[in-house]
């Protein structure tokens, strides 16, 4: 069993049960999935840019991403409907816990001038969104092979009903929030 999942079942669940007075263990919020999305704006002019983004995302997530396509045509961006413009990957189960563990303990501390992640990035429904400016913070990415610094969005979807519950869940799992 993954280190973070073990921590969740042994420490986090009892702590949340006592703090929020849940009647049943099934009411305790848990992490449902993590979605990593990488928008590649250059893919319009340069289709090769998408291939490297897909490769990097595969290394980071440990599974193959889905290529996302444009929903509508936008003339200002020279964009046609159905053109590939990004990649996303949805992690669940073991891979999700492995990725979150790696993100919290290895990758986030490697961010330049890191003072903790924002407390305001909850969406009101108990989900947390985190923007990352460069993919180099992940240990799997080789600095020499990177042709362009790309950012990504990481969305942590939880079963929590309120932001407060979700914040408590992530704090107990070790997410470094700003003081």
From Swiss-Prot:
- Alphabetized Pfam families for the sequence: Ribosomal_L5, Ribosomal_L5_C
- GO molecular function (one): rRNA binding
Coiled coil (residue ranges): none
Listed A to Z, the keywords are: Ribonucleoprotein, Ribosomal protein, RNA-binding, rRNA-binding, tRNA-binding
- Superkingdom assignment: Bacteria
Q: Which family does it belong to?
A: Belongs to the universal ribosomal protein uL5 family.
Name the job this protein performs.
This is one of the proteins that bind and probably mediate the attachment of the 5S RNA into the large ribosomal subunit, where it forms part of the central protuberance. In the 70S ribosome it contacts protein S13 of the 30S subunit (bridge B1b), connecting the 2 subunits; this bridge is implicated in subunit movement. Contacts the P site tRNA; the 5S rRNA and some of its associated proteins might help stabilize positioning of ribosome-bound tRNAs.
**How does this chain assemble?**
Part of the 50S ribosomal subunit; part of the 5S rRNA/L5/L18/L25 subcomplex. Contacts the 5S rRNA and the P site tRNA. Forms a bridge to the 30S subunit in the 70S ribosome.
Give the protein name, as stated in the record: Large ribosomal subunit protein uL5
**Originating organism:** Geobacillus thermodenitrificans (strain NG80-2)
């Amino acid at each position: 069993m993954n280190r973070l999942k073990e921590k969740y079942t042994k420490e986090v669940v009892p702590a949340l049960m006592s703090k929020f007075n849940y009647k049943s263990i099934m009411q305790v919020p848990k992490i449902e999935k993590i979605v990593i999305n990488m928008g590649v704006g250059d893919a319009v002019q340069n289709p090769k840019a998408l291939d490297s983004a897909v490769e990097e995302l595969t290394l980071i997530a440990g599974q193959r991403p889905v290529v996302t396509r444009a929903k509508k045509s936008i003339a200002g961006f020279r964009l046609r409907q159905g053109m590939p413009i990004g990649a996303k990957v949805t992690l669940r189960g073991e891979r999700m816990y492995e990725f979150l563990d790696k993100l919290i303990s290895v990758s986030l501390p490697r961010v330049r001038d890191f003072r903790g992640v924002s407390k305001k990035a909850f969406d009101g429904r108990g989900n947390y969104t985190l923007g990352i400016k460069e993919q180099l913070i992940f240990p799997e990415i080789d600095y020499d092979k990177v042709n362009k610094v790309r950012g990504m969005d990481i969305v942590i979807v939880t079963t929590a009903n309120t932001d407060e519950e979700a914040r408590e869940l992530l704090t107990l799992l070790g997410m470094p929030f700003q003081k």
